[in-house]
């Protein structure tokens, strides 16, 4: 039976967030609603989740010794990774020493590396994926591209938000694509994955919850990507009953193999009734921000319930809903937002993340909308996002 202590007291239930961006902020808020003591950690000060946490720390989370020292000092009941740039080998060590990593250290280690999760899905579980090859040198990269054929995509095995990814259509692009992949890798270079292009009708994120009362699914979320990042997402994404059944089976198999309780963002390609696995994140997903308006329990509330060992029961979806990112481009450490009065149309909401600065393009907020149809919800959310004026 779960017992939650009182925050800031000796018996407090403590959650340490490793990563304190906009997704971590919502997880922190859900923890606060249950009286949980929140410790927010990131590589920079005043990150969004730090603004709603009891305490915060700035460290290099890729430094295993620094991470270990902080965990030992704070003694959290739950360590909740919210980003991928973490010393995952140290998380494994900490888990072996008795610390609770969400959903588990092995899931975090496997999913931060495209090679780990691809081999688990395709080779261990036999899940359909794109054709692929791995390469750790420019020569082997050329061989991998030759084996896959054109067009193909190259990605660092360790990167996020589209960093280091290129679409290759001809041999003339190989040298530039290799250099870009090496620059975009999280560890400053290394192995890459070369993937064949997948013919698909649409992409979905299937939010899958592994909880004490079993596996649960949210309604499929459709989304549009640009430059490796999502721009709009919507729920529900219409798909055939057979495709949805296959998607749920695939997501369930992957999530169970990864292990641990929590919410997982499973990314899939859908073509007719066929479903192909893409990636999975063992944490709330950026495209899932639409659930802040589309469901009775957001993806963040579901994640917290699951890792605490609480039952999920059923998830109610309210109908056609969408999100659109607020993505200004400027340079400032004193960002201001205006025109909110005119931006807020009926049945819409805005979330401003409170990021302390911006250099170039940065996701600073999200617009949420509900409507009669998903197409209408998308257009309304885009209109709201575009109406928010951001200046420095």
UniProtKB/Swiss-Prot annotation:
Give Gene Ontology CC terms: cytosol
Any one Gene Ontology BP term: 'de novo' IMP biosynthetic process
Annotated ATP binding lies at 114, 155, 160-165, 195-198, 203
Q: Where does N(1)-(5-phospho-beta-D-ribosyl)glycinamide bind?
A: 22-23, 82, 286, 355, 362-363
Residues recorded as binding Mg(2+), renumbered to this chain, are 267, 279
Q: Which molecular function term from Gene Ontology is one that the record holds?
A: phosphoribosylglycinamide formyltransferase activity
Top-level taxon of the source organism: Bacteria
Q: Which UniProt keywords apply?
A: ATP-binding, Ligase, Magnesium, Metal-binding, Nucleotide-binding, Purine biosynthesis
List the PROSITE patterns hit by this protein, alphabetically: ATP_GRASP
Which reactions are catalysed by this chain? N(1)-(5-phospho-beta-D-ribosyl)glycinamide + formate + ATP = N(2)-formyl-N(1)-(5-phospho-beta-D-ribosyl)glycinamide + ADP + phosphate + H(+)
Matching entries from SUPFAM superfamilies are given as:
Glutathione synthetase ATP-binding domain-like, PreATP-grasp domain, Rudiment single hybrid motif
- Give the E.C. number(s): 6.3.1.21
Q: Which InterPro entries match?
A: ATP-grasp, ATP-grasp_carboxylate-amine, ATP_grasp_subdomain_1, PreATP-grasp_dom_sf, PurT, PurT/PurK_preATP-grasp, PurT_C, Rudment_hybrid_motif
Matching entries from Gene3D superfamilies are given as: 3.40.50.20, ATP-grasp fold, A domain, ATP-grasp fold, B domain
Show where the ATP-grasp domain sits.
Answer: 119-308
Q: What cystine linkages occur within this chain?
A: none
Q: Spell out the subunit comment.
A: Homodimer.
According to its UniProt entry, the function of this protein is described as:
Involved in the de novo purine biosynthesis. Catalyzes the transfer of formate to 5-phospho-ribosyl-glycinamide (GAR), producing 5-phospho-ribosyl-N-formylglycinamide (FGAR). Formate is provided by PurU via hydrolysis of 10-formyl-tetrahydrofolate.
- Say which family it is in: Belongs to the PurK/PurT family.
Name it: Formate-dependent phosphoribosylglycinamide formyltransferase
State the organism of origin: Pectobacterium atrosepticum (strain SCRI 1043 / ATCC BAA-672) (Erwinia carotovora subsp. atroseptica)
């Amino acid at each position: 039976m779960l017992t939650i202590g009182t925050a800031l007291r000796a018996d407090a239930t403590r959650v340490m967030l490793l990563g304190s961006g906009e997704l971590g902020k919502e997880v922190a808020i859900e923890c606060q609603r249950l009286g949980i003591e929140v410790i927010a950690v990131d590589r920079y000060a005043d990150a969004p989740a730090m603004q709603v946490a009891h305490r915060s720390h700035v460290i290099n989370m890729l430094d295993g010794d620094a991470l270990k020292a902080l965990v030992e000092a704070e003694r959290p009941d739950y360590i909740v990774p919210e980003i991928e740039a973490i010393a995952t080998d140290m998380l494994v060590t900490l888990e072996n020493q008795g610390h609770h990593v969400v959903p588990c250290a092995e899931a975090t280690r496997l999913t931060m590396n495209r090679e780990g999760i691809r081999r688990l899905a395709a080779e261990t579980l036999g899940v359909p994926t794109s054709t692929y090859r791995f390469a750790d040198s420019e020569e082997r990269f050329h061989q991998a591209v030759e084996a896959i054929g054109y067009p193909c995509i190259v990605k660092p095995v360790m990167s996020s938000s589209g960093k280091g990814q290129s679409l290759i259509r001809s041999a003339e692009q190989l040298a530039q694509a290799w250099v870009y992949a090496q620059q975009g890798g999280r560890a400053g270079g290394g192995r890459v994955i070369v993937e064949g292009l997948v013919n698909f009708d649409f992409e979905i994120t299937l939010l899958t919850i592994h909880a004490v009362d079993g596996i649960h699914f949210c309604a499929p979320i459709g989304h549009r990507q640009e430059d490796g990042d999502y721009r709009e997402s919507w729920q529900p994404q219409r798909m055939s009953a057979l495709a949805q059944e296959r998607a749920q089976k695939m997501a369930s198999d992957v999530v169970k193999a990864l292990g641990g309780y929590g919410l997982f963002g499973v990314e899939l390609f859908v073509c007719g009734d066929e479903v192909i696995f893409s990636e999975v994140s063992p944490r709330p997903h950026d495209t899932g921000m639409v659930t802040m308006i589309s469901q009775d329990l957001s993806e963040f509330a579901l994640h917290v319930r699951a890792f605490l060992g609480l039952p999920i029961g059923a998830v109610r979806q309210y109908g056609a809903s969408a999100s659109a990112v607020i993505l200004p481009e400027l340079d400032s450490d004193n960002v201001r937002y205006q025109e909110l009065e005119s931006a807020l149309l009926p049945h819409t909401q805005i979330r401003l993340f409170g990021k302390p600065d911006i250099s170039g393009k940065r996701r600073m907020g999200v617009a949420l909308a509900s409507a009669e149809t998903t197409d209408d919800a998308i257009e309304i959310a885009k209109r709201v996002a575009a109406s928010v004026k951001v200046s420095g």
